[in-house]
Amino acid sequence: IKDENGTLVWDIQHLVNEVIRGVARCKEIGKIPSTVAIDTWGVDYVLLDKNKKEILPVVSYRDSRTDKVQDEVAQIISQQELYAKTGIQKQNFNTIYQLYCDRKSGKLDNAEYFLMIPDYLSFKLTDVIKNEYTNATTTGMVNAETKLWDKDIIERLDLPKHLFNELNTPCSLIGNFTKEIQDYVGFDSTVIFAPSHDTASAVAACPIDDNSVYISSGTWSLIGVESLKPIVNTESQKANFSNEGGIDYRFRFLKNYMGMWLFQNIRKNLDKKYTYDEMMHLAQSSTCVKYFDVNDESLVAPDNMLTAVNNLIGDLPLADTLSCVYHSLARSYKNAVDEIEKSADKTIDNIFIVGGGSKDSYLNKLTAQY
């Protein structure tokens, strides 16, 4: 992400280049894949014009532009109605609000194609334009019952209907590498759809049952259960839970919390003076426990994460601040499990933790304790 004239945007060409470099590396190490599939974070997208050229910039979900349109969208379609249709958690950065910003600015006027980030990266490998289901559900515009784009939402927000095409399920074929890609990487391969929302892929690999929850622990912590049907009720809306699409049309009933983002940015603010293990040991050396809302808006994209956290809990020594971050995360997980039991009418006995954050033994320990 980079700041471009006050707007947080993705260096999309860099992302494309890194994907292609990663594919080329397969040939270098002698492990040529028969298929390639891409997953990424949700909600962000790329618009293409009729010539399949990018309409830039590709704005990041961490940009604050959507804060100004929440009330406008709610006047057109209430959050209660949106949730009843889509089952998606209210978050200021949801695609629905980003697209509404683009409509107001005129950015959609010349848009012919709408691709979520993994769809776009697959397009750059194959020159085939297709949309995938699981990531599309993070837009807040896919009907949870029909599993199709909700035409009523699209019409009421006056979004161009031609942007929203067929939604393909995971494992569907996209196409083979273009000749240009083949020449660069040194081989051909078939590109297919993964569950292209990264959490959908992570959950697909989780051995969860009816009495288990998963925590996909990465930049975000996503906590939830799998369900054959969307769970849309007063309790789930009040607790702000999402019903995101999963493999085989299973639903990921979950809630998003800030996760390793807090530690990543604190470490960056300290000029990477400490490793993550050293930060963990500092936290363990402290007995200080203060709680804060890990989803506080001030933590989404602060200039300085350490300062932002201390604004919530008071100015504390580093070890104490880190301890409070750990305990606040673990308590948020506990609260989410309590809400799942209430909303989904389940008793939770096991927690499966996947993702990079699963390497944090102290956070795992606190999660078990809470």
Where would I find each of the regions flagged by the language model?
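N-terminal glycine/serine-rich phosphate-binding loop of ATP-dependent small-molecule kinases
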Residues: 1-57, 67, 84, 110, ...
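A conserved helix-loop-beta module that forms one wall/lid of the active-site cleft
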Residues: 151-172
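Short loop/turn motifs at secondary-structure junctions
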Residues: 31-32, 163, 330, 347
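Short, conserved phosphate/pyrophosphate- and ester-handling motifs at nucleotide-, phospho-/glycolipid
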Residues: 11, 63, 198
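Short, intrinsically disordered, charge-balanced linker/junction segments flanking boundaries
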Residues: 1, 163, 355-356, 367-370
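Active-site core segments that coordinate phosphate-bearing ligands/cofactors
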Residues: 67, 74-87, 92-116, 122-130, ...
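Short beta-strand-loop/turn "lid" adjacent to the catalytic site in phosphate-handling enzymes
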Residues: 4, 28-61, 86-93, 118, ...
